Curated annotation (Swiss-Prot):
Organism, as annotated: Rhodococcus jostii (strain RHA1)
Protein name as catalogued: Aspartate carbamoyltransferase catalytic subunit
Reaction equation(s) it catalyzes: carbamoyl phosphate + L-aspartate = N-carbamoyl-L-aspartate + phosphate + H(+)
Oligomer status and interactors: Heterododecamer (2C3:3R2) of six catalytic PyrB chains organized as two trimers (C3), and six regulatory PyrI chains organized as three dimers (R2).
EC number, as in UniProt: 2.1.3.2
Family: Belongs to the aspartate/ornithine carbamoyltransferase superfamily. ATCase family.
Length: 314
């Protein structure tokens, strides 16, 4: 695997190997007074974010530093992009500066693929490119950490019924999770108003429903999504209040879930809209576990791309 741009870059076997690798990194760090492994010593990892981020950017930076990499954060607002430099020139500059890995978030779908194409393969000195979210396309490492969290909470993903609820249309998280969870044997159902479903969703490996209340009793997990108002230029639903009434996860709706079911959210959460504060803070919600798993999962991805399928270094 040269890059991680899409869930399509993975097979079921390689996805499970990454989940296992993440848990090995978690174990390797347990009990260490200094959370450092020498695995990526001498490697240069650059995070290049053209959109705001807290969880993804920070967890990639922590992952790189815990593996002893030199981590450099390239902010679009303080780079030559703000002066009109093209994405290609920026990417080639970072390659020339010695990046071993480029972790890219960009508002345009396909941006990470283009950067990987421009900068070349590792075989000819190019960096590994990791898609940290490209427009409404994909966010593969988020799906991987969500799958890891589900596996830890549910024991196995095979045969589980998992709902992805909310703004499917604008969500790269929904796309990556639908592909990965289906690959791992889950039954995935998308729950959203018709206006927030993408064209062509019938080709996805999922079923579609419009009533959240009807789905909750039969679920093993529910992944709540934020309404991405910043990507909307029209009326996709009458009001925030009506959206919350129909698709928000309230305490009453939480009680409809089976006792073992778990609630996930990729963040940031809009409390009071897609999820009630009491639900967000419930022990049945795995939001902080997702963040913790995000660090270990991204350690695994960096390791696989830059080192290969070897044992975790001491």
């Amino acid at each position: 695997m040269k890059h991680l741009l899409s869930i399509a870059d993975l097979t079921r076997e390689s996805a499970v190997e990454l989940l296992d690798e993440a848990e090995r990194f978690e174990q390797a760090l347990l009990g260490r007074e200094v959370r450092k492994l020498p695995t990526l010593r001498g490697r240069t990892v650059m995070t290049v974010f053209f959109e705001n981020s807290t969880r993804t950017r920070v967890s990639f930076e922590v992952a790189g530093k815990w593996m002893s990499a030199d981590v450099i954060n390239v902010s679009a607002s303080s780079s030559s992009v703000s002066k009109g430099e093209s994405l290609r020139d920026t990417a080639m500059t970072l390659r020339a500066a010695g990046a071993d890995a480029l972790i890219v978030r960009h508002p345009a779908s396909g941006a990470a693929h283009q950067i990987a194409k421009w900068t070349g393969h590792q075989d000819d000195g190019g960096p590994a490119v990791i898609n940290a979210g490209d427009g409404t396309h994909e966010h593969p490492t988020q799906a991987l950490l969500d799958a890891l969290t589900l596996r830890q909470r549910l024991g196995d993903i095979e045969g589980k019924r998992i709902a992805i609820v909310g703004d499917i249309l604008h969500s790269r998280v929904a796309r990556s999770n639908a592909l990965l969870l289906s690959m791992l044997g889950a039954e995935v159902v998308l729950v959203a108003p018709p206006t927030l479903l993408p064209v062509g969703v019938s080709a996805w490996p999922v079923s579609v429903a419009h009533s959240l209340d009807a789905e909750l009793p039969g679920l093993d997990a529910v992944l709540m999504l934020r309404v991405q108002a910043e990507r909307m230029n029209g009326g996709f639903f009458p009001s925030q209040r009506e959206y919350s009434i129909n698709y928000g996860l309230s305490e009453k709706r939480l009680a409809l879930l089976p006792d073992h079911a778990v609630v996930l959210h990729p963040g940031p959460m809009l409390r009071g809209m897609e999820i009630a504060s009491a639900v967000a803070d419930s022990t049945r919600t795995a939001v902080l576990q997702q963040v913790t798993n995000g660090v270990h999962m991204r350690m695994a991805v960096l390791f696989r791309l830059l080192v290969g399928a070897e044992e975790v270094a001491g």
